[in-house]
């Protein structure tokens, strides 16, 4: 079972009574056929549920009102099978608070050249019915997605499925609770921000809990539960000699297991699906949570270090969006650069907390090594390299008057040399279009040093995310040129300033 099983998407057909009962009967018949086929063959993440035809203002308004109040409804897919006068949609769309996609399709793929007549023309009017609907969306400044293509086309299936992921993610985000263990890392700017504005814009709430509250739960974990979790570690990872039975760091592994079990219990009891820690506020914990955080991220929790609640929330959102897709998604930080003419590279990592979902196939190494930052006992962590291939890094920042999403398209590469003294998981990548352009654009746009790294999602997914939440997006990819990028930032200042 996945999060998508908790939701459904309503399929709504727009028409009108002008064409008579027989035409409406055929429209209904076509709709049933299309919905059944999409549910069976399109590999959509959510089930489509066909609703009654929308043929009058009252019917359409009722559907939109019901969608708002049905917690299982993640959004609406609308198909204008015939011409559906768009003034009928104004009241419904004005109250709709769920994501909306217009599927610009028709029942037949090819025109029946020899038999086409006016009955056929009146029945299959998406070509101009869809434009009428599009006008009222533009007139009302109604944000909605549009997918054009035949309902049997695999590309259309893929695009509808991607939108469904956004719709479900948006509903999940409205219920998301972010727990900050301790506060922000002292004097750090980008990890701070307006939590009230974030809840208004995205729906997630952010609150702080004292580390002592967590420690109380951690200390209540029994030895039997710890031993059972250690058994899971033994089967899942390659343990270094120091962490094996009778190793001199075995007790550190047991303490890491205790922290993991305590953290998970605390998060479950509070209904939290994202959290932060900071190494400046660990009072009562024997070590910085490393292994615990890595494993919780792999289970779908959002996380970021140093109290960075925006990145923690974004990671959870992107985890939901990517559920069931190939590739992983993790908290990440641009840590250090490799400057070599024609082969500039970025080494991404964090002190400990990189999600194993992005790891290469072989078992991660479980080790305990010294960590100077934080002043605690040596923490346990998983060490691994990252899968290669196309990926993205994304950052959500608070500009005071709005949110900006930055996305850099990257290409992860194999580490050319072993890293025998680096005791943390890492990812190595080439930034698009090149490191100087990418880093300068990122810095000029105010991008954070913390990011969400993903092999599973791509730029199109993040564009949809920005659109569905009505926030600014700044893209850095192979098409980026700094003068044009700077111009776009200036234009966005004007656009969003006027939009306020």
UniProtKB/Swiss-Prot annotation:
Origin species: Salmonella typhi
One Pfam short name: AraA_N
Function text: Catalyzes the conversion of L-arabinose to L-ribulose.
Cofactor note (record): Binds 1 Mn(2+) ion per subunit.
Name of the gene encoding the protein in the UniProt record: araA
The protein's name: L-arabinose isomerase
EC number: 5.3.1.4
GO molecular function: L-arabinose isomerase activity; manganese ion binding
BP GO annotations: L-arabinose catabolic process to xylulose 5-phosphate
Tagged with keyword Isomerase: yes
Residues binding Mn(2+), per UniProt: 306, 333, 350, 450
């Amino acid at each position: 079972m996945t999060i998508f099983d908790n939701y459904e998407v309503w399929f709504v057909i727009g028409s009108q009574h002008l064409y008579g009962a027989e035409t409406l009967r055929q429209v209904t018949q076509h709709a049933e056929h299309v919905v059944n086929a999409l549910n069976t063959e399109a590999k959509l993440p959510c089930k489509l549920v066909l609703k009654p035809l929308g043929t009058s203002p009252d019917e359409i308004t009722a559907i939109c009102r019901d969608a708002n109040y049905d917690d299982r409804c993640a959004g609406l897919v609308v198909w204008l099978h015939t011409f559906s006068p768009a003034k009928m949609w104004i009241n419904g769309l004005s109250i709709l608070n769920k994501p909306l996609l217009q599927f610009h399709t028709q029942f037949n793929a090819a025109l029946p050249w020899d038999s086409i007549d006016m009955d056929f023309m009146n029945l299959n009017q998406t070509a101009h019915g869809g434009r009428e609907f599009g006008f009222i969306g533009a007139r009302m400044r109604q944000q909605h997605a549009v997918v054009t293509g035949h309902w049997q086309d695999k590309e259309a299936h893929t695009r509808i499925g991607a939108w469904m992921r956004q719709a479900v993610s948006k509903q999940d985000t409205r219920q998301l609770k972010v727990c900050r263990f301790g506060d922000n890392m002292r004097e750090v700017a980008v990890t701070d921000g307006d939590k009230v504005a974030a809840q208004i814009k995205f729906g997630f709430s952010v609150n702080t809990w004292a580390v002592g509250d967590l420690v109380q739960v951690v200390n209540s974990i029994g030895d039997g539960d710890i031993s059972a979790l250690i058994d899971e570690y033994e089967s899942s990872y390659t343990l270094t000699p120091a962490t094996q039975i009778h190793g001199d760091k075995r007790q550190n592994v047991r303490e890491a297991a205790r922290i993991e079990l305590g953290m998970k219990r605390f998060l479950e009891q509070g209904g939290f699906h994202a959290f932060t820690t900071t190494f400046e506020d660990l009072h009562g914990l024997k070590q910085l949570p490393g292994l615990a955080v890595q494993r919780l991220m792999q289970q779908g929790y959002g996380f970021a270090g140093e109290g960075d609640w925006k990145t923690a929330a974004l990671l959870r959102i992107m985890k939901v969006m990517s559920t069931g897709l190939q590739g992983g998604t993790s908290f990440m930080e641009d840590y250090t650069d490799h400057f070599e003419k024609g082969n500039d590279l970025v080494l991404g990592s964090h002190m400990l907390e990189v999600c194993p979902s992005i790891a290469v196939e072989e078992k991660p190494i479980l080790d305990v090594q010294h960590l100077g930052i934080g002043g605690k006992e040596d923490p346990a962590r998983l060490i691994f390299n990252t899968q290669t291939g196309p990926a993205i890094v994304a950052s959500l920042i608070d500009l005071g008057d709005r949110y900006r999403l930055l996305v850099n398209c990257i290409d992860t590469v194999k580490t050319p040399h072993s890293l025998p003294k680096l005791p943390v998981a890492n990812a190595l990548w080439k930034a698009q279009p090149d490191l100087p352009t990418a880093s300068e654009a990122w810095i000029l746009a105010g991008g954070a040093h913390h990011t969400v790294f993903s092999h599973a999602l791509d730029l199109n997914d993040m564009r949809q995310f920005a659109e569905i939440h009505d926030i600014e997006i700044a893209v850095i990819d192979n098409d980026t040129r700094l003068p044009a990028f700077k111009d776009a930032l200036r234009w966005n200042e004007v656009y969003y300033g006027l939009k306020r």
